[in-house]
Amino acid sequence: MTKVLLFLGLLAIPRASWPQSDARPEILVLGTYHMANPGHDIYNMRADDVQSPERQQQIAQLIEVLKRFHPTKIAIEADVGSQRIGREYSDYLAGKYTLSRNEIDQIGYRLAKELGHRAIYPVDVDGDFPMLRVINYAKANGRKEKLDAIGARTAARVKAQDDFLRSHTVLEMLEYMNSDSLVAKDVAEYFAMVPFGEPWEYAGPDLLASWYQRNIRIYHNVVARIDSPSERILVIYGAGHLGWLRQDIANDATVRLRKLEDLTGRAPIS
């Protein structure tokens, strides 16, 4: 334990060397649905056309709310080594790129341009998600019915989000998805995987550990962009990452966690 604390102390040295005050960098993670319907997740929402005139007005409303955070940097869910993002954003600033339906474009690029940012920061890192191991373990050990029940709950929650989006604005949808109650339910479904395993075949725990690993690496890439205690980083990410990234921020004493509801001044619709 002593070695762990020493290691963590060494990691904190660069930011700990700043002048001591109550000022800390602030990080706000905006959990979003995937507006372009890429279908990359096990359970996926079916979003309507974000480029329709009505949705575009709603995106503009969302942008105005996010400006209240006064972001100094915007981080997005794209590969940390991506050169494409830099080219696209530069072309967008030059009027040579047409925004796609992706939330990176619709929220990230638009907001960054309106704030006068010259760059936008990809922070994603891919990771293993060994769901097949969990499925095979459940089948081999008479636990398939329990695993199916977890999947059914997740599918029902995604369906409820589909229904919610059809009758609410983009801002209201994101308020709903970023609410503490919905985030807690999402995190709970990951922890429901923990019992699927036994000594020497930790299928469920390994899945959760892999997810933890990916998200803490993402968080590393976010905090690596902090240059001063007055930094305010907006992180735009798929909502499945929200609970885990918030946990990282909340447990890091060198930064301050902010939430969407801090900007709206109202409780999320639930």
Write out the residue ranges for each language-model feature:
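Sec-dependent signal peptide recognition
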Residues: 1-7
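Boundary at the C-terminal end of the N-terminal hydrophobic targeting segment
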Residues: 17-23
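N-terminal post-signal-peptidase region of extra-cytosolic proteins
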Residues: 48-63, 93, 220
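Proline-aspartate-enriched helix->loop->beta-strand connector
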Residues: 70-76
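Acidic/histidine-rich helix-loop elements
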Residues: 34-55
